[in-house]
């Protein structure tokens, strides 16, 4: 099978790039920036008519599979290319799969929009264009889902676990951490949630994440 991932690490494409790197897959990284019209070419729009990265193509025995949406791409990679035996980030059973789906949908619904606002107005945008009031309002809203995350991590820690839905790093952790990392520029917010901060550091310090961030350089 040939797996191709379109996108750049400095985008939501980091999610499937990280997943593929975590699994040690040989894949083609098609560098596609969201700037400069690269996602608006006829060739790219044939892959993803939304004109967004990431998109992936997977040549399988059943035919070519095309997936877009970053969480869908990450979950697909884990299921299609993971061992499914508890030895990697893929789900080992239906319980883990259900939890991974739950966390992926949850983080997109409850955190991503406000996390992106924090990232943009605390770090990514030119300083003259940042609006502290927007960042502060987003941080206030984020305290609600962060309390949920902190509570789950507390329950897992009581069992001697360091991750969300199994006693190992899974695609569920990858999905949530890939959004949580956008909050790190927030001054002081993460100090209110020490278990979440420690878990996030464990996830982002993984060699596969560090390697994925360097792809295309």
Give the ranges of each region predicted by the language model.
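GST-like domain detector, emphasizing the conserved glutathione-binding G-site
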Residues: 1-132
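A generic structural-conservation signal
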Residues: 29, 192, 212-213
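Generic structural signal for individual residues within well-ordered alpha-helical segments
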Residues: 45, 98-101, 175, 197, ...
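Residue-level recognition of oxygen-bearing side chains
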Residues: 72, 195, 208
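Active-site-flanking alpha-helical
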Residues: 78, 179-180, 213
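GST-like fold's C-terminal all-alpha helical module
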Residues: 95, 104-201, 205
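C-terminal helix/juxtamembrane-tail motif
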Residues: 216-217
């Amino acid at each position: 099978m040939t797996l191709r991932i379109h996108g750049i690490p400095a985008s939501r494409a980091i999610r499937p790039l990280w997943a593929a790197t975590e699994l040690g897959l040989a894949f083609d990284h098609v560098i596609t920036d969201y700037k400069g019209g690269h996602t608006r070419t006829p060739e790219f729009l044939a892959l993803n008519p939304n004109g967004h990265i990431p998109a992936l193509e997977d040549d399988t025995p059943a035919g070519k599979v095309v997936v877009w949406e970053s969480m869908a791409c990450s979950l697909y990679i884990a299921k299609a290319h993971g061992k499914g035996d508890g030895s990697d980030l893929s789900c080992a059973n239906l319980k883990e799969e259900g939890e991974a789906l739950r966390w992926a949908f949850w983080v997109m619904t409850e955190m991503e929009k406000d996390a992106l606002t924090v990232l943009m107005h605390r770090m990514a945008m030119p300083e003259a264009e940042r609006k502290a009031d927007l960042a502060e309002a987003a941080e206030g809203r984020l305290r609600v889902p962060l309390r949920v995350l902190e509570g789950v991590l507390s329950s897992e820690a009581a069992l001697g676990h360091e991750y969300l839905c199994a006693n190992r790093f899974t695609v569920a952790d990858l999905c949530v951490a890939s959004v949580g990392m956008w909050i790190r520029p927030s001054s002081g917010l993460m100090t209110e949630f020490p278990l979440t901060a420690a878990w996030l550091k464990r996830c982002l310090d993984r060699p596969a994440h560090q390697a994925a961030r360097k792809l295309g350089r």
